[in-house]
Amino acid sequence: MNIHEYQGKEILNSFGVRIQRGTVARNAKEAVEAAKELTEKTGTGWHVIKAQVHAGGRGKGGGVKLAKNLKEVEEIAGEIIGMNLVTPQTSAEGKKVHQVLVTEDVYYPGDNEPEEYYMSVLLNRATGRNMIMYSTEGGMDIETVAEETPELIFTEEIDPATGLLGFQARRIAFNLGLSGKGFKEMTKFVMSLYEAFEKSDSSLFEINPVLKTSDDLIMAVDAKVTLDDNALFRHKDYAEMRDVREENATEVEAREVGLNYVDLDGNVGCMVNGAGLAMATMDLIKQAGGEPANFLDVGGTADAKRVEEAFRLILKDDKVEAILVNIFGGIVRCDRVAQGIVDASKNMGDAMNVPIIVRLQGTNADIAKELIDNSGLKVSSAIQFQEAADKVQEVLSK
């Protein structure tokens, strides 16, 4: 589950990670009030107005701007709130901004020049261990750094038996070229950051940039946090941070009815039971010359009602030109799935106007085939995997 920057910073702050202070505002008036309060605390009249959407690259899209007085705060907040922000990580339509984060300006003058770093904590799936990835090239797209100057990216893997050890945090600070107060501050920052990552059951922390201020304080200026959905039962307060306005509407609807659905950009809808079979089915669609329009796992308890709900979700996508139903009946009874297909056709009528290829194998597959054959539906049946692929290819070539 993705959350907003300000929510991620709240989590970081609760574990002792120093953050760039700020207040959320939902209109220009609230933004001005937030700026006034920050001025009282910091003594500076400069503020940064940051659009709160679930997407990176906000600055490139005009979603992060500096305001040097209250008038500019009001103007910029009014301009950003309500806009459709287009970034390299959004669709062409962009995402509507409902709120902004009004923050303090932390690039103040002092004895030293401020310096930016990149740091993230994530699971290295190749080794099965958490890993801290960091670089001196903060404030930039880490993908660009990895491609052009990979030698500037460092990694530190953490043994799950011991957790992050002090010498590892010190090594990170050393590799970033820090010394004196900055070295001690970075060591403390890294230890607190990793504690926050573990105890919040997150799958990703990305801080870009981590800032060393002119007086050698280390703080998180930005925060991209992804929480593990499967652990939200342990964090009721985090679960309340979900902003469904930022999520795909069909995915939200699927979650509410207990289906695992991920929206994709292709033209062939797929309905499968089991994540492994779903992945194989998506490969099958690719080999047949199509592109998967979705990942949809109806689960091990698929019945007629769930199958009908699945069809409704798939057909919400106007790009879908065909649907492949690929079910292996172990616990799932194929006849129930077949009944769901028949019921969906009756209840949805003309909405089910795309070709449907059905492969039902396993428990009660013979009964399922009889149900579909006697239904009068224009459904293509397949027994073998390759046969299903051929029928998808045939449909797409028409």
UniProtKB/Swiss-Prot annotation:
InterPro entries, A to Z: ATP-grasp_succ-CoA_synth-type, ATP_grasp_subdomain_1, Succ-CoA_synthase_bsu_CS, SUCC_ACL_C, Succ_CoA_ligase-like_bsu, Succinyl-CoA_synth-like
Quick one: which residues bind Mg(2+)?
Answer: 208, 222
| Top class in the EC scheme | ligase
Which residues does the annotation say bind substrate? 273, 330-332
Mind listing the GO molecular function terms for this protein? Answer: ATP binding; magnesium ion binding; succinate-CoA ligase (ADP-forming) activity; succinate-CoA ligase (GDP-forming) activity
Lineage at the top is: Bacteria, Pseudomonadati, Bacteroidota, Flavobacteriia, Flavobacteriales
State the protein's name: Succinate--CoA ligase [ADP-forming] subunit beta
Species, as recorded: Christiangramia forsetii (strain DSM 17595 / CGMCC 1.15422 / KT0803) (Gramella forsetii)
Q: List the disulfide bonds.
A: none
* Presence of keyword Ligase: yes
Q: Which reaction does it catalyse?
A: succinate + ATP + CoA = succinyl-CoA + ADP + phosphate; GTP + succinate + CoA = succinyl-CoA + GDP + phosphate
* Keywords, in A-Z order: ATP-binding, Ligase, Magnesium, Metal-binding, Nucleotide-binding, Tricarboxylic acid cycle
Look up the record and report any one GO term of the cellular component aspect: succinate-CoA ligase complex
Matching entries from PANTHER family are given as:
SUCCINATE--COA LIGASE [GDP-FORMING] SUBUNIT BETA, MITOCHONDRIAL (PTHR11815:SF10), SUCCINYL-COA SYNTHETASE BETA CHAIN (PTHR11815)
Q: What does this protein do?
A: Succinyl-CoA synthetase functions in the citric acid cycle (TCA), coupling the hydrolysis of succinyl-CoA to the synthesis of either ATP or GTP and thus represents the only step of substrate-level phosphorylation in the TCA. The beta subunit provides nucleotide specificity of the enzyme and binds the substrate succinate, while the binding sites for coenzyme A and phosphate are found in the alpha subunit.
Q: In which pathway does it act?
A: Carbohydrate metabolism; tricarboxylic acid cycle; succinate from succinyl-CoA (ligase route): step 1/1
Q: Kindly indicate whether the keyword ATP-binding belongs to this entry.
A: yes
